[in-house]
Amino acid sequence: MTDSFGFAEEALEQEVDLENNPTARVEELKARVLKENVNDPEDIMLLIMESFTIQEIVPEAGKFYTFIYNAKTPNISYDQHPLIACVEIFRWGFRGLNFHWQNYRNYTWEEIPGQLMVVEFQELDELLALQYGKFILNN
């Protein structure tokens, strides 16, 4: 069952102290970013792809994901590395709350060149702190 925002209730009910209980893969990722002095969004996304090995082809409403996206619509700005909460699935793709944009966005299947990396609720703040969103104007 989902609430009016499209999130699974159990995801919203989780109360996790992110500072004291981050997942091991995020700690490893943060350590690599610091050790390798990585600050380019492309390079950070590559490290995320190496660390986040649980992947899905089709998202599930109420779950969190990050992935690479190449928009087809001309003259729009888009995030090439979205971090989203999936809220709806359609034949053409899905809709998600993009945490980098802080807005709902539509994602079509054809514009996702790979798979969606599953993100756990308790990893969201840590990933947002990495600032790996890559905002592009599609010409």
Please provide the spans of the model-predicted regions.
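Hydrophobic/aromatic hotspots within intrinsically disordered, low-complexity regions
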Residues: 5-7, 12, 18
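Mixed-charge, Lys/Arg-rich low-complexity intrinsically disordered regions
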Residues: 15, 19-61
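Catalytic phosphate/metal-binding cores of nucleic-acid and nucleotide-processing enzymes, i.e., regions
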Residues: 45-46, 71, 77-79
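Short coil-to-beta transition motif at edge beta-strands of beta-rich domains
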Residues: 55-75
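Generic structural motif
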Residues: 70-72, 89, 124
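Basic/aromatic-rich interaction segments and small domains that mediate binding to polyanionic partners
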Residues: 77-107
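Intrinsically disordered, low-complexity, charged/polar segments
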Residues: 98-139
